[in-house]
């Protein structure tokens, strides 16, 4: 069911997120309702909408019925991993997002859709981030993180073997920089 590349990436999943949680010094914060003006929320929604359209087009073009469960698995993984908050100094918490790993496995376009699904469910059912701020939260965590993480992963790992430790370092760097940039 999984390709050799996907299997190799999943092999490093536990190590990657263990290291990521230990070294996380920034927070991917959900923006609540009332923090942004309605005009800003609308603009952020307009900014994220083209990325959703690109992701949906990519899913339609490249995914088949056999691979659709992978998107659901990545969305569920992102949803679950965002529920584990790590206390940070200053009275706030941080959490892993799962967007970097999703981008490495299926590409940043499809990862945007998977993470957006998780964020929308969290906003509507758990109050984690505001409903009006869905565009801003999806832009910060479902667009910025996957695209930056994927670019860094590709630049650092280049054509190394799938079981190379360089790929683990590339995944860590991509995830860490992606979360850091997404937090700003």
Task: Kindly give the residue locations of the regions a language model identified.
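N-terminal membrane topogenic signal
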Residues: 1-16, 36-41
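Aromatic-anchored segments of alpha-helical transmembrane domains
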Residues: 19-26, 77-83, 119-126, 175-184
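Hydrophobic alpha-helical transmembrane segments
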Residues: 42-43, 68-73, 112-116, 168-173
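Membrane-water interface at transmembrane helix exits
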Residues: 53-60, 86, 122, 126, ...
């Amino acid at each position: 069911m999984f390709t050799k590349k996907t299997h190799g990436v999943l092999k490093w999943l536990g190590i990657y997120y263990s290291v990521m949680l230990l070294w996380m010094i920034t927070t991917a914060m959900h923006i609540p309702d009332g923090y942004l003006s309605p005009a800003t929320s609308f603009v952020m929604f307009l900014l994220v909408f083209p990325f959703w359209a690109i992701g949906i087009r990519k899913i339609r073009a490249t995914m088949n019925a056999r691979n659709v469960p992978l998107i659901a698995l990545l969305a569920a993984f992102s949803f679950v991993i965002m529920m584990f908050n790590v206390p940070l100094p200053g009275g706030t918490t941080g959490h892993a997002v799962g967007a970097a790993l999703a981008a490495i496995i299926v590409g940043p376009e499809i990862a945007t859709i998977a993470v957006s699904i998780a964020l929308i469910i969290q906003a509507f059912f758990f109050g984690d981030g505001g409903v009006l701020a869905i565009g801003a939260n999806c832009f910060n965590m479902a667009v910025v993180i996957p695209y930056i993480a994927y670019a860094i992963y590709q630049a650092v790992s280049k054509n190394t073997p799938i079981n190379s430790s360089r790929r683990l370092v590339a995944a860590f760097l991509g995830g860490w920089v992606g979360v850091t940039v997404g937090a700003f």
